[in-house]
């Protein structure tokens, strides 16, 4: 039947000589309609399309050997599937268990039954569903509805099937095909300008785009526009829309494309959201325990120490004790606040601080000028210094402060060790900020303690203080008795 119109061997020879394009698929002039057999009459308007389909089938054979993902044809070429070369290629595929005579593609090796293959990309496996595509019925040809594509059991990997298209394709009525078959000129068919061909190309391109996005194992020939024209003839899943005229078929193809585009985008956004969610959660878990190590809260660092130093001594309260008392409470940040973690603080509202100091000392005429003169008295005693370049900014010298309060303490070694290290901090960040040399040790942590001579037999305070705590992450038993209330070390 096909030898009367065009030679299949001639088309294959042309394909071997040069890559086929839409302008090269025409191999022979159309023979007279009287030379055509009666069965060929209903297909006569598909002459150049058939030649393209033949070349596409050959192309699909080569793609199948390259582990391509799209393969199929129309029922009119069912005899091609019985060829020795294709049968051997199909036999090399893994056989599906419990399928009888089928393979992983679900293709029965029965040359007498004409079936179409609807291949859908499922990662590296090709799941397919066989259904009748074209049938000859009296006066015209009617395209039947493709069943919902489902992957055969046992072939697809145990992963999310991104490429399976579950929506059923619409039905193209016979009126659409009859309108296309009324075109008498062969060049118009060769240039694929008919609405039927355009509709197939548009529908198949959306299918190819959807599957190509879902996996990196798509056929290389499906990435260009020309190969879309070739691959579009053999893809079994089509997003066709019903239309009564030939021109309407081309216009209605966009609906199917939009359907599959939205399907594709929903999968893409879902997968990207999932991956971003996992990565952000992992980063959050990784960075959470260390977020406070980078930016420790000075109120939690200096709070217990400030309160204890402010209440130390006997007799009337001194100005530096009063300032430490205000700094120990973060609610007083409107008038005085810590600046960083090196002992620096700033009088945000110096008049309010002076007023509160006057209330404490029963001096209602107290102002900032008198208070600042009193602060200068502490410069010589190394209790605090003025921060140059900043207004209303001062800095406590904890070493001089400890030396000033040492005579009032009965056992300074035990006092400072227990007060500064054994206080129940709520997080390890507050503890490590006093011990780790990476958190301003030269300005605040080291200056909290008096000189090495005043510690008696503590020959090397840095070695004795920092070594067990720096090893606490490796051997927690060194500090476990003292850190039972710390959730970080639990």
From Swiss-Prot:
Keyword DNA-binding set for record: yes
DNA-binding region boundaries: 317-397
Chain intervals with Low complexity compositional bias: 211-227, 271-280
InterPro entries recorded: Ets_dom, ETS_fam, WH-like_DNA-bd_sf, WH_DNA-bd_sf
Keywords attached to this entry: DNA-binding, Nucleus
Biased composition (Basic and acidic residues): 196-207
GO molecular function terms listed in the Swiss-Prot or TrEMBL record: DNA-binding transcription factor activity, RNA polymerase II-specific; sequence-specific DNA binding
SMART domains given in the database record: ETS
Chain residue ranges for the region called Disordered: 190-255, 271-294
GO process terms (BP): cell differentiation; regulation of DNA-templated transcription; regulation of transcription by RNA polymerase II
Matches recorded under Pfam families: Ets
Localization: Nucleus
Tissue: Embryonic ventral nervous system, higher in the thoracic than abdominal segments.
Biased composition (Gly residues): 244-255
Main location: nucleus
GO annotations of cellular component type: nucleus
Protein name in UniProt: DNA-binding protein D-ETS-3
Gene name of the record: Ets65A
């Amino acid at each position: 039947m096909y030898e009367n119109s065009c030679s299949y061997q001639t088309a294959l020879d042309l394909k071997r000589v040069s890559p086929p394009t839409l302008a090269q698929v025409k191999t022979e002039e159309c023979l007279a309609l009287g030379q055509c057999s009666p069965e060929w009459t209903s297909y006569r308007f598909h002459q150049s399309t058939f030649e393209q389909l033949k070349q596409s089938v050959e192309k699909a054979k080569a793609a199948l050997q390259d582990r391509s993902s799209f393969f199929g044809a129309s029922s009119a070429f069912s005899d091609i599937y019985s060829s020795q070369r294709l049968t051997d290629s199909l036999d090399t595929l893994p056989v599906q268990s419990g399928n009888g005579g089928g393979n992983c593609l679900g293709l029965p090796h029965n040359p007498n039954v004409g079936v179409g293959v609807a291949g859908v990309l499922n990662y590296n496996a090709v799941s397919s569903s066989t259904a009748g595509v074209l049938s000859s019925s009296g006066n015209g040809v009617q395209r039947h509805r493709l069943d919902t594509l489902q992957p055969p059991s046992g072939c697809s990997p145990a992963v999310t099937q991104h490429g399976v298209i579950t929506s059923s394709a619409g039905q193209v009525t016979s009126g659409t095909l009859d309108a296309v078959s009324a075109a008498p000129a062969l060049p118009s068919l060769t240039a694929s300008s008919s609405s039927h061909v355009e509709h197939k190309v548009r529908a198949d391109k959306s299918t190819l785009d959807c599957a190509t996005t879902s996996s990196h194992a798509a056929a290389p020939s499906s990435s260009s526009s020309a190969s879309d024209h070739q691959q579009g003839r053999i893809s079994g899943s089509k997003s066709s829309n019903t239309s009564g005229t030939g021109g309407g078929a081309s216009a209605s193809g966009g609906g199917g494309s939009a359907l599959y585009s939205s399907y594709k985008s929903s999968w893409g956004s879902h997968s990207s959201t999932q991956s971003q969610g996992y990565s952000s959660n992992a980063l959050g878990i990784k960075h959470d325990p260390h977020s406070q190590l980078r930016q420790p809260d000075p109120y939690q660092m200096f709070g217990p120490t400030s309160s204890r130093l402010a209440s130390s001594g006997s007799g009337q309260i001194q100005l530096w004790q009063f300032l430490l008392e205000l700094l120990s409470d973060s609610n007083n940040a409107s008038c005085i606040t810590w600046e960083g973690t090196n002992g620096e603080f700033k009088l945000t509202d110096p008049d309010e601080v002076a007023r509160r100091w006057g209330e404490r000392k029963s001096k209602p005429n107290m102002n900032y000028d008198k208070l600042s003169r009193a602060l200068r008295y502490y410069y010589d005693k190394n209790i605090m210094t003025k921060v140059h370049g900043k207004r209303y900014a001062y800095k406590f010298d904890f070493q001089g402060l400890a030396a000033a309060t040492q005579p009032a303490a009965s056992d300074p070694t035990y006092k400072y060790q227990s007060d500064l290290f054994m206080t129940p901090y709520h997080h390890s960040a507050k503890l490590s900020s006093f011990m780790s040399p990476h958190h301003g040790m030269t300005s605040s942590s080291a200056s909290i303690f008096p000189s090495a001579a005043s510690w008696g037999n503590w020959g090397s305070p840095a070695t004795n203080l920092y070594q067990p705590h720096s090893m606490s992450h490796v051997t927690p038993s060194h500090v476990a008795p003292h850190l039972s209330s710390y959730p970080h070390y639990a």
